[in-house]
C-alpha cells in the first residue's frame, strides 16, 4: 500500500511566487528609475521620486522580494516535500525530497516489528492541523501527512483506521 504526499508544486505556492517576484521587480525598477532619472516602468512615472531615501528603500525592498521570489520558484522547481509512504507486511518506507545537496532525499525504512501505533493529532484554532504519525517502540514519531491544507477530519480518521488495520497496530488520538 502506497500513499503519495504532494510537495511544493501547488497552485497557491505558484501564485505567491509569481506575485512576490513581479512585485519585487516593480519595486526594484521603480528604485532604479529614481536613480537614473528615467522612466523604466510603463504604467507609472517614477523618475520624479527622490533617490535618497525613497528610491534606495524601493531598491532594497525590491531586491529582498526578488530573492524571496527566486527561493520560492526554486522550491517549486525542485518540488521540495514531495514523497510517498510505502507500507508492506515486512517494512515501512517513508521517502521525501528536499533541497539539493548531500541530504537531498530522505529515505527512512523501518521493519514492521518496531511500529507501536498510528497516532492521529488534531489541533483546531487559528492554525488547524490534522496529522498522522507513525509511532515507533523507541518513542519516535514519524509524520505521515504533508503540509498542505488540512484534510477533512473523517478522511484522516478513515486513513488512520485503514492503516492501523493493515499494519495490525493500535490507533492513538491526541
Curated annotation (Swiss-Prot):
* Bilayer-spanning residue ranges: 11-31, 56-76
- Role played: Seems to be required for the assembly of the photosystem I complex.
Location(s) in or outside the cell: Plastid, Chloroplast thylakoid membrane
This protein's major location comes to plastid
Q: List GO BP terms, alphabetically.
A: photosynthesis
Give the protein name, as stated in the record: Photosystem I assembly protein Ycf4
Keyword check for Membrane: yes
> What are the record keywords, sorted?
Chloroplast, Membrane, Photosynthesis, Plastid, Thylakoid, Transmembrane, Transmembrane helix
Q: Which domain of life is it from?
A: Eukaryota
Family, similarity comment: Belongs to the Ycf4 family.
A Pfam entry, by short name: Ycf4
The UniProt entry lists membrane topology as: Multi-pass membrane protein
- Output the InterPro entries linked to this UniProt entry: PSI_Ycf4_assembly
User: Among the entry's GO cellular component annotations, what is one?
Assistant: chloroplast thylakoid membrane
Amino acid at each position: 500500500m502506497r500513499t503519495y504526499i504532494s510537495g511544493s508544486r501547488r497552485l497557491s505556492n505558484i501564485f505567491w511566487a509569481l506575485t512576490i517576484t513581479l512585485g519585487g521587480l516593480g519595486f526594484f525598477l521603480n528604485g532604479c528609475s529614481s536613480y537614473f532619472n528615467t522612466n523604466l516602468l510603463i504604467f507609472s512615472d517614477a523618475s520624479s521620486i527622490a533617490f535618497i531615501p525613497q528610491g534606495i528603500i524601493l531598491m532594497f525592498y525590491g531586491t529582498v522580494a526578488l530573492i524571496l521570489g527566486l527561493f520560492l520558484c526554486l522550491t517549486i522547481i525542485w518540488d521540495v516535500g514531495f514523497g510517498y509512504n510505502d507500507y508492506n507486511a515486512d517494512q515501512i518506507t517513508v521517502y521525501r525530497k528536499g533541497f539539493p545537496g548531500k541530504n537531498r532525499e530522505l529515505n527512512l525504512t523501518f521493519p514492521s516489528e518496531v511500529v507501536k501505533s498510528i497516532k492521529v493529532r488534531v489541533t483546531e484554532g487559528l492554525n488547524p492541523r490534522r496529522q498522522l504519525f507513525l509511532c515507533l517502540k523507541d518513542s519516535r514519531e514519524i509524520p505521515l501527512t504533508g503540509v498542505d491544507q488540512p484534510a477533512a477530519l473523517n478522511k484522516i480518521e478513515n486513513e488512520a483506521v485503514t492503516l492501523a488495520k493493515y499494519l495490525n497496530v493500535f490507533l492513538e488520538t491526541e
